[in-house]
Amino acid sequence: MGSTSDKIAGKTNEVAGKVKKNVGEATGNNELRAKGAAQETKGKVQTSVGKAKDAVKGAVDRM
């Protein structure tokens, strides 16, 4: 995946995970809350990977 794709997928997973987590908390559904928290974390990692790719590309471009 390219850096932009990673960042978009990451943000999508973050938002979807946050929604699931909040719905799970509101309804007392611990399984949904946990799945949402995991998806949110996955999204944060994907976003970080995209940012890291941008940083590496920027460093290489400056050489």
From Swiss-Prot:
This is UPF0337 protein Atu0782. Belongs to the UPF0337 (CsbD) family. It holds the Pfam family CsbD. Residues 1-63 are annotated as: Disordered. InterPro entries: CsbD, YjbJ_sf. It comes from Agrobacterium fabrum (strain C58 / ATCC 33970). Residues 51-63 have a biased composition (Basic and acidic residues).
